[in-house]
């Protein structure tokens, strides 16, 4: 578990949130290419080469009632995630911070590059299967990064799968800002350490997002 994710989970647990891991297993026929929003079209726009979708294998944080908490770190914001954000699915989820996420994808891809060039992230066996061989790390002019595409599409699948079973997904970004002591603070700066003095202000922001 990544450090920021661990600190977020601990913050929720010590403040009496009942949190458990959720393995979001979804029937394969849910994502029939002709029936469920525009997932198939988005997959093909990303360069998908199979007639099936990837499995969702991430462990998500589940809290009552029927709510999933996800923390998106730096590698989730890039040109490929921006493509998935065009899905008409997001028109059905008014609580999703769509404009913020589009802006993060446009403005912070350089940060994604800093952490997203290692081979297991840029390309791997699964991404080769679904999107074909990747270009050299950092080369976006050919096939680009299959690993980044895979991660972006799985984010979309998570949102679609949760919507299909009437779960709420609340996505927090490391780039989110919240007001604390009269100043805008960025989420990643607070989650860098579990003893940050503004932890309680962060908790209030999280609770407000959950209740929206």
Q: What residue spans do the PLM features occupy?
A:
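Nucleic-acid endo/exonuclease domains
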Residues: 1-212
């Amino acid at each position: 578990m990544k450090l920021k994710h661990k600190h977020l989970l601990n913050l929720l647990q010590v403040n009496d949130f009942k949190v458990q891991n959720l393995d979001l297993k979804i029937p394969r026929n849910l994502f029939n290419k002709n029936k469920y929003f525009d997932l198939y079209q988005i997959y093909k726009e990303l360069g998908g080469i199979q007639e099936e979708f990837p499995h969702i294998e991430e462990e998500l944080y589940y809290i009552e009632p029927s709510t999933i908490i996800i923390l998106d770190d730096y590698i989730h914001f890039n040109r490929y995630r921006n493509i998935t954000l065009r899905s008409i699915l997001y028109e059905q989820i008014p609580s999703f911070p769509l404009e913020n996420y589009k802006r993060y994808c446009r403005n912070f891809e350089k940060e994604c590059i800093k952490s997203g060039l290692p081979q297991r992230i840029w390309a791997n066996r699964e991404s080769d299967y679904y999107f074909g061989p990747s270009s050299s790390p950092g080369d976006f002019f050919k096939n680009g990064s299959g690993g980044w595409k895979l991660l972006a599409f799985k984010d979309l699948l998570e949102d679609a799968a949760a919507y299909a079973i009437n779960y709420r997904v609340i996505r927090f970004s490391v780039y989110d800002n919240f007001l604390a002591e009269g100043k805008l603070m960025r989420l990643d700066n607070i989650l860098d350490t579990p003893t940050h003095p503004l932890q309680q202000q962060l908790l209030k922001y999280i609770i407000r997002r959950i209740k929206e």
